[in-house]
Amino acid sequence: MDMVENADSLQAQERKDILMKYDKGHRAGLPEDKGPEPVGINSSIDRFGILHETELPPVTAREAKKIRREMTRTSKWMEMLGEWETYKHSSKLIDRVYKGIPMNIRGPVWSVLLNIQEIKLKNPGRYQIMKERGKRSSEHIHHIDLDVRTTLRNHVFFRDRYGAKQRELFYILLAYSEYNPEVGYCRDLSHITALFLLYLPEEDAFWALVQLLASERHSLPGFHSPNGGTVQGLQDQQEHVVPKSQPKTMWHQDKEGLCGQCASLGCLLRNLIDGISLGLTLRLWDVYLVEGEQVLMPITSIALKVQQKRLMKTSRCGLWARLRNQFFDTWAMNDDTVLKHLRASTKKLTRKQGDLPPPAKREQGSLAPRPVPASRGGKTLCKGYRQAPPGPPAQFQRPICSASPPWASRFSTPCPGGAVREDTYPVGTQGVPSLALAQGGPQGSWRFLEWKSMPRLPTDLDIGGPWFPHYDFEWSCWVRAISQEDQLATCWQAEHCGEVHNKDMSWPEEMSFTANSSKIDRQKVPTEKGATGLSNLGNTCFMNSSIQCVSNTQPLTQYFISGRHLYELNRTNPIGMKGHMAKCYGDLVQELWSGTQKSVAPLKLRRTIAKYAPKFDGFQQQDSQELLAFLLDGLHEDLNRVHEKPYVELKDSDGRPDWEVAAEAWDNHLRRNRSIIVDLFHGQLRSQVKCKTCGHISVRFDPFNFLSLPLPMDSYMDLEITVIKLDGTTPVRYGLRLNMDEKYTGLKKQLRDLCGLNSEQILLAEVHDSNIKNFPQDNQKVQLSVSGFLCAFEIPVPSSPISASSPTQIDFSSSPSTNGMFTLTTNGDLPKPIFIPNGMPNTVVPCGTEKNFTNGMVNGHMPSLPDSPFTGYIIAVHRKMMRTELYFLSPQENRPSLFGMPLIVPCTVHTRKKDLYDAVWIQVSWLARPLPPQEASIHAQDRDNCMGYQYPFTLRVVQKDGNSCAWCPQYRFCRGCKIDCGEDRAFIGNAYIAVDWHPTALHLRYQTSQERVVDKHESVEQSRRAQAEPINLDSCLRAFTSEEELGESEMYYCSKCKTHCLATKKLDLWRLPPFLIIHLKRFQFVNDQWIKSQKIVRFLRESFDPSAFLVPRDPALCQHKPLTPQGDELSKPRILAREVKKVDAQSSAGKEDMLLSKSPSSLSANISSSPKGSPSSSRKSGTSCPSSKNSSPNSSPRTLGRSKGRLRLPQIGSKNKPSSSKKNLDASKENGAGQICELADALSRGHMRGGSQPELVTPQDHEVALANGFLYEHEACGNGCGDGYSNGQLGNHSEEDSTDDQREDTHIKPIYNLYAISCHSGILSGGHYITYAKNPNCKWYCYNDSSCEELHPDEIDTDSAYILFYEQQGIDYAQFLPKIDGKKMADTSSTDEDSESDYEKYSMLQ
């Protein structure tokens, strides 16, 4: 155990070190550098950026002509890009691609070919999210790092270890491994991505890789998928074409027993990039992007033609090495000749396309076995192909790899492509290659599963063993014998050797075994009842987890094991499943609890679910909660005892008491829904909507079978934002907690309270690549997935309160200014001066608008102009000039590069140029290292005299991207016109300037480390701590029952106002079921995308009490009736058909066990204020209503209500109907308060066990009871309708249908114990479900698909809990089981036939 922990810690430390080095950048690789670059190194770099060992010769006249021709083609390509929609499908595009794409526009061409910009717009910020997620959780970090260091290391871009391009390559591959976990990372991806990075920015290169791997035309997924359909299809084509064009080469390869086509195709892309010159690689890559996979086979054919003489002279081992690693070496033709032959070969292949076999489907790979060479006399002859061995049945046919047994001689090892030497292994009688082992090993074919390293034998491979370690060529793997009866085809694929998964990622023999499981007498393995796993049928862990949780609900399992469901199947329910769901689930439960099997395959149930819910078909991962809801609803409808559902009118509360509305709603629910699912899982919610206009309240009561609780902390977003002020002080980072639907206006308000700036002074901006990319609007919702990081800049406060994000006009009322110091007021504090020199205006005026106005204003106002979108400020970006080694024109020798944090510089129509320099210097001076003391006076004198070099930078007018001039036309290649440091006004007519740092000052004085220095406000730590702290289940329930305001998009239609109005909504728990299911909503839809919350929720395993969240009941209604587990007051005598109806419109705020209130609004008063004979009791004292002499003082009202006949209610009280008037209502309460207890006493006297027979109830009695807020009716209908259970009809049911009392010895408060948990680990796009459940033997088990292991309760992973299953304490399971005496079992023969027929079809399809 310690070794495993040490290994894990070492691996985590290694991941951390790798990420730290890439984050640190080039400095992390300095120790590995080989010293300074030698003089004249530029003469060793060719025009493609490849560094050669020797100095390159001068450019020849032919090469110069080629370069000039390429420059001439640039204008034609620019025209084509301008009219791309016209040319993108034309033959002219293909012709020009074969002629060559100019280097300077290869990036834009690739961008339009792969449609990069469109997918970027559809996925803003997605790359950054994937990159950060990859840093946290990617399992490919080590392998990516190993490949990055060897990718294009002879190129100047990738030469520096942890340099800029290596970092970009590493992050792209890391992000893609999370974006597409199915592919993850493969070695070839590093070479492909490196090519993209030569001409595309980092994010564009990422989306280029995404588009390429998703393109059906390029078929790259087939090279990396487990089934290898692309490679198989190309091989099928080559086996028809190449032998005709290169017969000698193919004969030589067959003679050596080597499948050369396979090896070459398996390594095609890597050889195509590494094996030839970069110039030719780029041109072939251009063609591949346009033509797609159809050029791959002609490229291989040309390579075979070039290599023919060398291949014919090479033996087997050398032949394999050359085909694998040196396939494209030493092309004997120049680039233009290769492209010319390629074009001709492609056209020829296109004409003969009809003679080729159809390509294999990508998802299935090749279904036909690969032909093997004929055998004669024990030696291999390559004169043709014999008939292929018989394959498996079509429904089970999957390719596998062939290999030699571990004890076979080294010479007899097959080639890595999978072709077996038949001189060592003769052909069996069935025509299937068998391995006649020299040392007496078992006969049969062999297959192996590849690992690059030798791992521990996984548990997935314990089926069909034995397995042996096997070492061959470049890989190590596990090998096992397979009998000839399997009749499975062989797979030739070399690069992905291994037993190929099915489409659902299961192993071939598992599906074959599972599909025939119903006909095979499997060996019975004794096990604990219920400790049986469920086989994963292809990403079905979500289904297995839900089934195991429901299966461990003991009353429901006993119901199915005893076969009671067969007596209650409802095959006529139009919204049911004709009994199929209940029948299949019952069969599965009986297998799970038989105690004879370690695992069961739920094929029939899965087929039934897929039939009625196609969304669960296929092999995609689904939500276990959605499956659970569908399963419970399906079981309920198939077992519903109501065969003809009556029409029920949905009524509004109309001010009626909650108790009355709740009883009516529950009664209506039971009239249509009565099953064991209702008895066990159904509760009732109270939903209240209050109109904010008139105060009208509408209340509804709805049933539920599980509670979906939001995670309160995840209803907030945690955001860290850096505030940069104008005074040049160190930036400060603040931590904010915002609502998920918060807008940027609310963000500014919170930030205002923390940083001391007014909202008008805060400018929010998204900073990316050292430039401002976007300004969020105030009315937009805050988004966490932005393209960069969010910053807040201080801007000069305008003279009138306007929105900085969308200014319309500015008031030019004067504002005081003293000595050129511009003052800012912040939250009522004293005016704070910012350091702007003399000459600044008294009012804030947009820069660049002076020419449009007279005296600077029009009627005291000045509108913003399009050329100056900012009010009173401009944006400055830091810039340095980088020398470019490859360029065509002299102005392109230096290219600008942005760095650091952009600045906000105050600027108006009155600002002088010198003021701009001073304002910039104030904000950047803290980044510059101070001058030595002896130079300080000289520097100050230079600044005073405004002489040439007084500032370490120069200001220039630039475009928004910071690369080109805003004044000069593009053909001048101007990088930005200089702004002189003078006294004249800075009329720049533009919103962006560049701060060009002088190279010497940048090197000697600029402190790069200071860029990342920020002061952290205490709110940052508070936000992080709140985000990481676990929450408890009570917090989730509190959030669920809290009041929320309905927004403008979901306005409520008020029946009183007769219009849609703003309203508030509140949910409350009214009735809790005996078995409570709690769903933690970890998956939430935020900012137009689904995300998973990893928040840890703490919950109780024992004695969980949710009664605090039940709607408080009026104590007068509870004094004689203990609370049921559903939170209702109920006298156990079976006299309630629709529950005791509450009289008061507003529930009392008191608890259930409090003394009677003295308030006149209560149903009954206490002893001191009650009418004569009116009883009063307190549960604390144990007193109750006086009973008759015949009643036992120790008898419980729960023992009542077992008579067959109907009950007669005694004549009590007035017959007046309840009034909504408070006066009438109170009078009704006083008149009937004492009579209610008399009613209970009379019932107690007549319905105790052994008591007298009851009398009948008259209609007038109903009226009397209703007048007092109650309705009692006979409930001897089985499982207690009045209790919320529904095992019988209302009224007219005999004692045969009744069951034992279900609520014996229940507590006043509902106390629950945990008995099952469904947990989800991983992320939204890829995760896994497991279940922890408590067995009747009081032991906990972990159900992980087919595995089931006992564990200690402390070992349960509660951090990943997703669905909780609680059981109320003190429940007798037998009370929920209906009596079946005298009932007829439903005929399930037709159901079985339908299920078996569909099951066979489903199995064949698998």
UniProtKB/Swiss-Prot annotation:
<dbReference type="GO" id="GO:0004197">
    <property type="term" value="F:cysteine-type endopeptidase activity"/>
</dbReference>
<dbReference type="GO" id="GO:0060627">
    <property type="term" value="P:regulation of vesicle-mediated transport"/>
</dbReference>
<dbReference type="GO" id="GO:0055037">
    <property type="term" value="C:recycling endosome"/>
</dbReference>
<dbReference type="GO" id="GO:0099092">
    <property type="term" value="C:postsynaptic density, intracellular component"/>
</dbReference>
<feature type="region of interest" description="Disordered">
    <location>
        <begin position="1120"/>
        <end position="1231"/>
    </location>
</feature>
<comment type="similarity">
    <text>Belongs to the peptidase C19 family.</text>
</comment>
<dbReference type="GO" id="GO:0005737">
    <property type="term" value="C:cytoplasm"/>
</dbReference>
<dbReference type="Pfam" id="PF00566">
    <property type="entry name" value="RabGAP-TBC"/>
</dbReference>
<keyword id="KW-0788">Thiol protease</keyword>
<feature type="region of interest" description="Disordered">
    <location>
        <begin position="348"/>
        <end position="380"/>
    </location>
</feature>
<dbReference type="InterPro" id="IPR050185">
    <property type="entry name" value="Ub_carboxyl-term_hydrolase"/>
</dbReference>
<dbReference type="GO" id="GO:0016579">
    <property type="term" value="P:protein deubiquitination"/>
</dbReference>
<feature type="active site" description="Proton acceptor">
    <location>
        <position position="1328"/>
    </location>
</feature>
<keyword id="KW-0833">Ubl conjugation pathway</keyword>
<keyword id="KW-0832">Ubl conjugation</keyword>
<dbReference type="InterPro" id="IPR035969">
    <property type="entry name" value="Rab-GAP_TBC_sf"/>
</dbReference>
<keyword id="KW-1003">Cell membrane</keyword>
<protein>
    <recommendedName>
        <fullName>Ubiquitin carboxyl-terminal hydrolase 6</fullName>
        <ecNumber>3.4.19.12</ecNumber>
    </recommendedName>
</protein>
<keyword id="KW-0472">Membrane</keyword>
<dbReference type="GO" id="GO:0036211">
    <property type="term" value="P:protein modification process"/>
</dbReference>
<feature type="region of interest" description="Disordered">
    <location>
        <begin position="1384"/>
        <end position="1406"/>
    </location>
</feature>
<dbReference type="GO" id="GO:0005764">
    <property type="term" value="C:lysosome"/>
</dbReference>
<dbReference type="GO" id="GO:0005516">
    <property type="term" value="F:calmodulin binding"/>
</dbReference>
<dbReference type="InterPro" id="IPR000195">
    <property type="entry name" value="Rab-GAP-TBC_dom"/>
</dbReference>
<dbReference type="GO" id="GO:0098978">
    <property type="term" value="C:glutamatergic synapse"/>
</dbReference>
<dbReference type="GO" id="GO:0005794">
    <property type="term" value="C:Golgi apparatus"/>
</dbReference>
<feature type="active site" description="Nucleophile">
    <location>
        <position position="541"/>
    </location>
</feature>
<dbReference type="GO" id="GO:0004843">
    <property type="term" value="F:cysteine-type deubiquitinase activity"/>
</dbReference>
<keyword id="KW-0967">Endosome</keyword>
<dbReference type="GO" id="GO:0005886">
    <property type="term" value="C:plasma membrane"/>
</dbReference>
<dbReference type="Pfam" id="PF00443">
    <property type="entry name" value="UCH"/>
</dbReference>
<dbReference type="GO" id="GO:0003676">
    <property type="term" value="F:nucleic acid binding"/>
</dbReference>
<dbReference type="InterPro" id="IPR028889">
    <property type="entry name" value="USP_dom"/>
</dbReference>
<keyword id="KW-0160">Chromosomal rearrangement</keyword>
<keyword id="KW-0963">Cytoplasm</keyword>
<keyword id="KW-0112">Calmodulin-binding</keyword>
<keyword id="KW-0656">Proto-oncogene</keyword>
<dbReference type="InterPro" id="IPR018200">
    <property type="entry name" value="USP_CS"/>
</dbReference>
<comment type="subunit">
    <text>Interacts with RAC1 and CDC42. Interacts (via Rab-GAP TBC domain) with ARF6. Interacts with calmodulin (CALM1, CALM2 and/or CALM3); the interaction is calcium-dependent.</text>
</comment>
<dbReference type="GO" id="GO:0099149">
    <property type="term" value="P:regulation of postsynaptic neurotransmitter receptor internalization"/>
</dbReference>
<dbReference type="InterPro" id="IPR038765">
    <property type="entry name" value="Papain-like_cys_pep_sf"/>
</dbReference>
<feature type="domain" description="USP">
    <location>
        <begin position="532"/>
        <end position="1369"/>
    </location>
</feature>
